[in-house]
Structures are given as structure tokens and as C-alpha cells.
């Protein structure tokens, strides 16, 4: 399944920058960054359960927020890209 994960972490307080880095790393471990606080993540249900628990354990819900957009099985037809940073097909062939 394809999930778009977005986050907003308050960095003005002590520990905020560290939480921001940890949230970004958790997302990077499962997907690709498409904007500063936006990741495209293609996971199976077990991986999603693990990532979601990890993310929600990292944030302070009174200051930070996470948003999940479930794009479904036909996500490639629903996503359009214009401009720099072309999309990477994580399921496609890898040429080394």
C-alpha cells in the first residue's frame, strides 16, 4: 500500500530538533522524501503497523502532528509530478 506521510514537529523547544531528525529518519527507513516534511511510503500492512507505532512514539502530540494519506492500490494513476526532483519508482528496476 502507498501512504503519504506528512509531519510538523515543533523545534522551538528543547528536544524538538532531535525529534524532527528522528521522525525524518523513521520515514526515510521506509520510503522516499518528496518534500521537506513529506514522504511517499510503500509498505505492507505489517510494516505500516510498525512504522506508525514508531512515528507516534517519537512525537509529542501536544506540540507535533502527523498526517497519513492512504493512496490505495492505483496510486500511480493518482499522482502527478511537475518540476524538479523526479519521482523514483521504488518498485522498478535498479541499474547500478
Where are these regions (language model features)?
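Basic nucleic-acid-binding interfaces
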Residues: 3-4, 10-96
